[in-house]
Amino acid sequence: MADTLMSDTPFWQRKTLDEMTDAEWESLCDGCGQCCLHKLMDEDTDEIYFTNVACRQLKIKTCQCRHYERRFEFEPDCIKLTRENLPDFEWLPMTCAYRLLAEGKPLPTWHPLLTGSKAAMHGERISVRHIAVKESEVRDWQDHILNKPSWAE
């Protein structure tokens, strides 16, 4: 009976992040693309500013990387979120499954692991497909900062 209950409980509810397999870890990503938007850092304050400028490898419509398995060959500065460095990424969105599970919170109802597709996530406008612009189209990066400091308003 206990084995049946364990198998009916989703892995993210019965395992810690450290206990998950690599495949389980990867499946937590909802594919929103927020990690794939460029961030700018203030040289004086180290404050992070979020932009709507997509990495060159992000396919904006699908919010998928063009070369995910080889992304570091194309973008050496690409983010690699791991169990070990997760605490360093304080800027992760409040909707990020990695962040939520690390904080002991449940996955959002629109998460692809619960719904079986990304449609609900896109419908909730969690993904960047509605706001992202191509890096090649950007002239002035400051025009694309989403969380502008008060001095830049």
UniProtKB/Swiss-Prot annotation:
Alphabetized Pfam families for the sequence: CxxCxxCC (PF03692)
Coiled-coil regions, chain positions: none
Database matches in InterPro entries: Puta_zinc/iron-chelating_dom, UCP006173
Superkingdom to which the source organism belongs: Bacteria
Family, as annotated: Belongs to the UPF0260 family.
Name of the molecule in the record: UPF0260 protein YcgN
